[in-house]
Amino acid sequence: MGAGEFPTTPPPHRYYAILAVLAQRQGIDKVAHTFLLQPGRWVLQGSWLERDGLPINVKGMTLVAWNRDNWFTMATKLIFPGSDRADIALQYKGRLDIGARQYTFLLQHNILGQVEGEGWIGLDTIVQRYWVLSDRERRSGFETLHRVNDDSYYLTSGIMAGHYLTSTMEASLERQRTN
């Protein structure tokens, strides 16, 4: 390369360093989530689908609280209006260190029992996976929460037994503002 000429593409290590600096300047390296990362009350509405069944309405509420030691609690209650499906109650307790993007949690589920899980916090999505402890059916599940805006998320989730889906849920979550 002669004097005054520029390379057509920077070396790979320089390329990633440049992208990181640009991301910082544009603020896209910062997490903008309000669900889970801030205390609050969220209303859920959507549909629940079980294997070989028709979708049914699901409604619910989630409360998120934090203490000073980076521990969070989350309580969710799901109801199925107009259906004989039993309500679902979930009690989470987890820890997320300041600046971290990964966390672990314990969950008490009124149908599945004791559950352990982990979560990852992306730029626009929170993904959780969990597994039921001491379970002969090898049940596990996942949740993906996609941020629509500060007050709204879209949730998709599924529960599996072994390698097979047994149920899925898709719902919107809307933050309830307190006065």
Predicted regions and their residues:
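Glycine-rich, aromatic-bearing surface loops/beta-hairpins
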Residues: 131-179
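Central antiparallel beta-sheet cores of small beta-barrel/beta-sandwich binding domains
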Residues: 44, 49-141
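Amphipathic/hydrophobic helical signal segments and adjacent flexible N-terminal regions
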Residues: 2-87, 165-179
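Alpha-helical context
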Residues: 10-14, 18-24, 40, 95-97, ...
